Amino acid sequence: LDVKIRYIKKWIDQRRLAAEMYNHYLAEISEISLPKVHKNTFHSYHLYVVEALHRDKLATYLNDINIATGIHYPKPLPALDCYKSHKLDLAEFPRAVSSAKSILSLPMFPEITEDQIRHVSSKIKAHYSK
């Protein structure tokens, strides 16, 4: 870790630049909601997570053409076993429930290129243009 920590600022800067490129190329796809960054916050973009209409179909399509995606948060927090004792009603968390059904992580790593981001974005656009 000592070796890697020297590169953390550079890697975060590269991820932030990649996120800007994704935001640019995906901006006009109405079926995709981009990550929101709130005022006075700093996003490291460890993941680049969008909300996608018909997420599972999009994920399957992208995976079938060798574009790796991920669903990093498949359950809303109140549905996790560690919260069972709290007897939480999922109906009280509609945004968490809907997000868990629509979020999709797109390829993100410090060395991702603009060409790769453009390729991923064009395939997403093609999927929704069918």
Ranges and model annotations:
Residues 1-130:
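PLP-dependent aminotransferase class I/II
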